[in-house]
Design a protein with these regions (language model features):
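Accessory RNA-recognition modules of RNA-modification enzymes
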Residues: 1-200
Length: 200
């Protein structure tokens, strides 16, 4: 059900795998939790996890110094993967990542200290159904999005039901990507929404 997930990439001997760490513990082998699958994540994330790590393991440009990965998925299956490295990313990495993105049908961003390489786009489009209407959202890498899209649809439906008999104007502070703003706008004369996060 989680539409996003973040993992460390753990290198041990010749093997590489997804990892998390015990809550409140220092990131180390003693607190390591291997995550070949992550049942709390969306089906599309779980389907991609083994394919991504197996493909990256075959290519030294993708494998070497790969430190962490962030997955962001949409209900449609569209996927944005951010691969985070402890090395400078060059043209060889970019070529390898472009091939990987084509093979897996995903969007990839490469990150390293002071670097962000966007291969195609740095967002996905999510479509949420609220009381029979579809709302399209651009969800940008690094910005906040509701982690559970189906629960989000129910939250938006509840908010619209409550707002149905209201009138006047709506002021929304910290609106993010307009998650509540768009569906609620149907119930008000004018809407003013603000956000401090530039990525949202």
């Amino acid at each position: 059900y989680r539409m996003r997930a973040e993992f460390r990439i753990w290198h041990e001997g010749g093997e590489m795998f997804y990892a998390m760490f015990e809550r409140g513990q220092k990131a180390s082998g003693a607190s390591l939790i291997r995550c070949d699958q992550f049942p709390a994540a969306s089906e599309s994330i779980n389907a991609l996890m083994p394919k991504l790590i197996e493909a990256a393991a075959q290519n030294p440009e993708l494998k070497n110094r790969w430190y962490a990965v962030d997955f962001l998925s949409a209900l449609s299956g569209e996927m944005l993967v951010t691969m985070i490295y402890h090395k400078k990313l060059g043209e060889a990495w970019q070529r390898a990542a472009e091939t990987l993105a084509r093979e897996l049908g995903i969007h990839i961003i490469g990150r390293s200290r002071g670097q962000k390489i966007v291969l195609t786009q740095d967002y996905i489009i999510e479509e949420l159904n609220v009381n029979g209407k579809t709302f399209r959202y651009r969800q940008v890498e690094g910005s906040f999005t509701q982690p559970n899209a189906r629960v989000c649809e129910k939250m938006l439906g509840w908010a619209c039901d409550v707002a149905q008999n209201l009138s006047g104007d709506l002021l929304e502070l910290y609106c993010g990507n307009g998650n509540f703003t768009l569906p609620l706008s149907q119930h008000f004369r004018q809407v003013l929404a603000t956000e401090v996060s530039k990525t949202s």
